[in-house]
Regions:
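Charge-lined substrate channels and their catalytic hotspots, especially those that engage the 3′ end
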Residues: 1-285, 292-337, 369-370, 374-377, ...
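Structured C-terminal cores of nucleic-acid metabolism proteins
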Residues: 35, 459, 477, 482-487, ...
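Residues that form generic nucleotide/phosphate-binding pockets
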Residues: 9, 25, 203, 217-221, ...
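Extended, compositionally biased low-complexity polar/Lys-Gly-rich tracts
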Residues: 80-81, 188-228, 398-402, 443, ...
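Residue-level signal for secondary-structure boundary elements
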Residues: 14, 18, 49-52, 172, ...
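Acidic/polar residues at beta-strand termini and the immediately following turn/coil
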Residues: 135, 349, 428, 663-665
Length: 666
C-alpha cells in the first residue's frame, strides 16, 4: 500500500531525483519515517524508471522529459522562464543545453550549441607570457586566449573582434596544464571558469581616442554604421523635389503658415505646427514628414530602417536610421520648399481636451525654421527674440497660449513631470574631443512643441483603436512593488514620503522633491522607480503620461515604430489593413531581449502559427525589435558620453568639482 502511494506521487511528476532527493521527497510528501523512506527510495530506484546523467543515476518522474535551457548570468532558464542557479565550468552566455528538471535545479544532460561565437574583447598580456582577452560586449566576464602564432603585438586599450575556435574546443584543450594553472590562480588573475580558445578576426579600434571610443560603442551595441550599397542606390534614386503627380489626392496646406521649431544643431525637421482659435477652443495642425511615401515595404530602404530601428545620437556624430538624402533631404520639412506630410488636424476645447480630429495626407511648405532659443527669447520679451521670429511672432504667441492650456490639462491628469536639465558637451571639431560642458535648459519653447506632439500621438493611437487595427502602441506600465520599496527606503533618508502609489501620489512627491536641496538625485531615484516604456501591439496605456492610449506618430525619420504607424493610418484611410513584415529576428537577442522576456531559442517560428496569431506575433516581435533598438541606442550614447567625460576629466587632475553621488553601480 505504501509503495502504491509512492508510485501515485510520481505519476504526474516532471522531475528527476537522486537517491538522497528521493528519500527527502518521500519524507516530506508522504510523512514516511526515515527508515521507510530509505527502503521506499531504494525500491523505486530498483523498479524505475531511471535515467543516467553524467555517471549518476536519477529516478525519473513519469512526466519527466528533457527540456532546452539557456545559460546566462550563472543560471539556467527554460522556455517557461523558470530560472535556477547553475555553475558551469565551461559555458558562454547564451549557450543551450538539454536538461531534466530537478526538485531544486536543472540537471544538465548534454550541450546543444553556442548561440554566439563572436565577441569584442580587449587584449591583455600577463607577466607569465600568456595573453587573455576580456569581453566588451557581454554583461559578465569571459576570458579568451589566442594561439601563439596569432598573438598581435600587445596594445593596451585596443579592442578586437574574436571568434571562439570550436574545432580546438571540441578537440580538447591542447594546454590542459595551462587551464589547470589558470583555475588554480583565478583569484590572482581575475579568471573564472573556462578560458576559451579563440582566433582574432579583426582589430576594431583603440579605446583611448575619441573616434575609437565611438567605433567601439557602435560595435558593442550592434549599431549599423554603413548603409549597404543597395540602400545607397535606392536613396540616390529618390527624387529631391515634390512632383505634381505626388501632390495629387493630397490636402493642399501650402498657404497655412506652418513653422518648425527645433534645436540649433538639428538637421532633420520631421514636424511642423500651426494653431488658430476655433470658437472657445483651438484648432491644432501637426504636420509630420510622410516618410512612408519614399520608404516602401520590402524595399532595401525599409529593410535597413527596420534593422536599425532608430537613429543613434552621439555627442560627436549621428548614426541615422535613413540615408541623408531622405533624413536631411526630401523628408525634412525645410523652409520654403514643398514637402509631403501626414497631418493630424485636431479640434480642442477651452480646457485642451480633443473633441475631434482627422488624419490627411497633405502637401505643405514650411514658412519658417526657428529654434527653441529664439522662441523662448521672444516669449521672454527680449528684442533679439522678436527680431528672430519676425512675422512669425503672432503664430508662435498663439501656440504659447495653447501650450498653457495643454500644460494645465497635463497637471490635472497628474502626468509625471520631471524638472528637465541636461548637460551638453561642446565638441572641439578638429580633435573630436570635448571642449567644455554646458548646462542646457529645457524651456517652455521645448515643452510647447512636446505638448503639440502629444496631442497628435494620442489622436493617432485613438484612430487605430477605433478602427480595430493592430499597430505598435507606446506603453508604460505602473511601477513594480519591489522598486517602490527601494524608493521608500531612499525617501526616508531625506524625510520624504510617497503617500500613495498613484499618479497623484507621485505628482505630490515630485513637487516636494523640487523644494529639496537634493533635487537631482531624488528625481533620478524616482525616475529609476518607473518601468521603462516600450512598444507593443497590446495597449495598456501610458502610466507616466496618464493616457489610456498612446503611440509614436511624430518622428518617422528617426523611429521605425512611427513609420509603421503612418502605414497603418494610411491603410485605414484607404479602407485596407496593413500587414507588416519582420525581415529578420537577429536584432531580438542579447541582454535587452532577455529583460523583455524574449528567448529566441524557445520562440516558435512565426510561419508555424495560424494566420490570426501570426499577424499579432509579427507586431509583437516588431515591438520587441524596436524597444531593443531604442535601449541599445541609449546604451551606446551613454557609453560614448561617459568615455568623453572621463577623458575630459583625466586632463584636469588637479581641479576639484562639487558633485553628488546619484547611484552605486558596483
Amino acid at each position: 500500500e505504501q509503495m502504491n502511494a509512492a508510485r501515485a506521487l510520481f505519476a504526474e511528476d516532471s522531475c528527476v531525483y537522486t537517491l538522497r532527493q528521493l528519500k527527502k521527497h518521500l519524507t516530506q510528501k508522504l510523512a514516511w519515517s526515515r527508515g521507510a523512506a530509505n527502503a521506499g527510495a531504494l525500491a523505486l530506484m530498483e523498479e524505475g524508471p531511471v535515467v543516467s546523467v553524467r555517471h549518476e543515476t536519477y529516478y525519473r518522474g513519469q512526466k519527466a522529459e528533457p527540456v532546452l535551457v539557456e545559460y546566462r548570468d550563472e543560471a539556467l532558464t527554460d522556455a517557461d522562464g523558470k530560472s535556477e542557479p547553475a555553475c558551469l565550468q565551461k559555458a558562454l552566455p547564451g549557450d543551450l543545453y538539454e536538461a531534466f528538471r530537478g526538485p531544486d535545479r536543472f540537471v544538465v544532460n548534454r550541450f546543444v550549441r553556442h548561440t554566439k561565437l563572436r565577441w569584442l574583447v580587449r587584449l591583455q598580456e600577463h607577466a607569465e607570457g600568456f595573453y587573455t582577452m576580456v569581453t566588451e560586449n557581454a554583461y559578465e566576464p569571459i576570458f579568451f586566449r589566442v594561439p601563439d602564432v596569432q598573438k598581435p603585438r600587445p596594445q593596451s586599450n585596443t579592442v578586437y573582434e574574436i571568434e571562439v575556435d570550436e574545432a580546438a574546443e571540441k578537440a580538447g584543450d591542447p594546454l590542459a596544464d595551462y587551464e589547470d594553472y589558470v583555475m588554480e590562480n583565478w583569484e590572482r588573475y581575475g579568471y573564472r571558469n573556462f578560458t576559451w580558445p579563440a582566433r582574432i578576426v579583426r582589430r576594431v579600434a583603440r579605446a583611448d581616442d575619441p573616434l575609437g571610443a565611438l567605433r567601439i560603442a557602435e560595435e558593442r551595441h550592434g549599431s549599423r554604421t554603413v548603409f549597404p550599397d543597395e540602400v545607397k542606390d535606392e536613396a540616390k534614386d529618390v527624387p529631391q523635389e515634390v512632383t505634381a503627380s505626388q501632390r495629387r489626392g493630397r490636402v493642399d496646406l501650402r498657404d497655412v503658415p506652418f513653422v518648425t521649431i527645433d534645436g540649433e544643431d538639428a538637421r532633420d525637421f520631421d514636424d511642423a505646427v500651426y494653431c488658430e482659435k476655433s470658437g472657445d477652443g483651438w484648432r491644432l495642425l501637426v504636420a509630420i514628414a510622410d516618410v512612408s511615401q519614399y520608404v516602401k515595404p520590402d524595399h532595401p530602404l525599409d529593410r535597413e530602417a527596420q534593422a536599425r530601428g532608430t537613429s543613434v545620437y552621439f555627442p560627436t556624430a549621428v548614426i541615422p536610421m535613413l540615408p541623408e538624402a531622405l533624413s536631411n533631404g526630401i523628408c525634412s520639412l525645410n523652409p520654403n520648399v514643398d514637402r509631403l506630410t501626414m497631418v493630424c488636424d485636431a479640434l480642442l476645447d477651452a480646457e485642451g481636451k480633443p473633441t475631434a480630429y482627422q488624419f490627411d495626407p497633405a502637401v505643405l511648405c514650411s514658412h519658417a525654421r526657428r529654434t527653441y532659443t529664439q522662441v523662448w527669447s521672444a516669449l521672454s520679451g527680449e528684442d533679439a527674440g522678436f527680431e528672430a521670429l519676425g512675422e512669425r511672432l503672432f503664430e508662435v504667441e498663439r501656440l504659447y497660449e495653447l501650450y498653457k492650456v495643454l500644460h494645465a490639462a497635463r497637471e490635472k491628469r497628474f502626468a509625471l513631470d520631471f524638472e528637465s536639465s541636461e548637460i551638453k558637451a561642446r565638441i572641439d571639431e578638429e580633435k573630436g574631443t570635448i571642449d567644455r560642458f554646458e548646462p542646457y535648459r529645457i524651456t517652455d519653447a521645448n515643452r510647447l512643441i512636446e505638448e503639440c506632439m502629444l496631442v497628435a500621438n494620442v489622436a493617432a493611437a485613438d484612430f487605430v483603436l477605433r478602427n480595430e487595427r493592430l499597430t505598435l502602441f507606446r506603453v508604460h506600465d505602473k511601477p513594480e512593488e519591489e522598486r517602490l520599496q527601494d524608493l521608500r527606503r531612499i525617501l526616508r533618508a531625506y524625510k520624504l514620503k510617497l503617500r500613495e502609489n498613484s499618479p497623484a501620489g507621485f505628482a505630490a512627491l515630485l513637487e516636494s522633491v523640487k523644494k529639496s536641496p537634493s533635487t537631482s538625485p531624488l528625481q533620478i531615484a524616482v525616475l529609476r522607480t518607473m518601468s521603462r516604456a516600450l512598444y507593443s501591439p497590446d495597449n495598456i496605456g501610458h502610466y507616466g503620461l496618464q493616457y489610456g492610449h498612446y503611440a509614436h506618430f511624430t518622428s518617422p525619420i528617426r523611429r521605425y515604430p512611427d513609420l509603421l504607424l503612418h502605414r497603418t493610418i494610411k491603410a485605414i484611410l484607404a479602407k485596407r489593413t496593413y500587414h507588416p513584415k519582420l525581415y529578420s529576428e537577429s536584432g531580438i537577442e542579447g541582454f535587452h531581449a532577455l529583460k523583455l522576456g524574449f528567448r529566441p531559442a524557445f520562440e516558435k517560428p512565426v510561419k508555424e502559427l495560424s494566420k490570426t496569431a501570426r499577424d499579432h506575433e509579427v507586431w509583437r516581435r516588431l515591438g520587441l525589435l524596436c524597444s531593443i533598438a531604442e535601449r541599445r541606442a541609449d546604451d551606446a550614447s551613454r557609453d560614448v558620453m561617459n568615455w568623453l567625460a572621463c577623458e575630459w576629466l583625466s586632463k584636469r587632475p588637479n581641479e576639484r568639482y562639487a558633485s553628488t553621488v546619484v547611484n552605486v553601480l558596483d
